[in-house]
Design a protein with these regions (language model features):
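Anion-binding and metal-coordination hotspots
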Residues: 1-207
Length: 207
């Protein structure tokens, strides 16, 4: 079970992710759509459980992989050559969508955009170098000759598409609920490794 970036999925899989069909609620497996998840009235007390719930979808996503082995390939002229053997990794992508997560991510982005607007007012090109995860990724220069930075609205709208989504890849046949429960507890496993690496001592070993 590994975390899978939705942004890095192939376009074919992305189309399935953003398609409304085949989503179900994680709590009871009832059918639900992304539109319903995005638009229900969260102030209605009857929707509290929905606000804390997730919509999920399971997508087959087999992929070719390098087996680390070699096989003999025979060409039409009779010549042979050893080439890397490819295998098929049978796996699934489990995608979830959360209204609560979507709103949280948009709140964070709004704060980043406010900081980006302040940075624009500095009008200092040397201070507007883009980073992959900082506020400067929302800025672009509209001139090739002079520094004329503006908000990159295309970049902002593209990033908004992924708000609320989370995905894991797995080759296990367990239920989506069980797999997601394990994935959500990954931080505990990572903490254990971190503690072991930090505080683990051993006596010298002589061979």
């Amino acid at each position: 079970i590994v975390t899978q970036s939705v942004k890095k999925l192939g376009q074919e899989i992305k189309d399935i992710v953003f398609n409304d069909s085949n989503y179900r609620l994680l709590s009871n497996d009832d059918a639900i759509t992304l539109k319903e998840m995005r638009t229900f009235d969260k102030k209605d007390a009857n929707n509290l459980s929905l606000y804390n719930d997730f919509a999920y979808k399971v997508i087959p996503a087999n992929t070719a992989m390098d087996t680390g082995l070699y096989e003999e390939k025979v060409y039409k002229n009779g010549r042979t050559k050893k080439v890397k053997a490819k295998g098929t990794l049978h796996q699934y992508i489990i995608v979830t969508f959360s209204r609560k997560m979507m709103e949280y991510q948009r709140t964070i982005r709004e704060r980043q955009l406010e900081r980006a607007k302040k940075l624009l007012r500095l009008k200092d090109p040397e201070k507007i170098k883009k980073g992959p995860n900082d506020i400067r990724r929302f800025l672009k220069n509209t001139s090739s000759d002079t520094a004329n930075y503006v908000l990159d609205m295309d970049k902002i709208h593209e990033e908004e598409k992924y708000d609320g989504f989370y995905a894991v890849a797995t080759n296990l046949d367990d239920s989506a609920k069980d797999i997601l429960a394990v994935a959500q507890n990954r931080y505990k496993i990572e903490d254990c490794f971190r503690i072991m690496k930090t505080n683990f001592d051993a006596r010298p070993v002589f061979l």
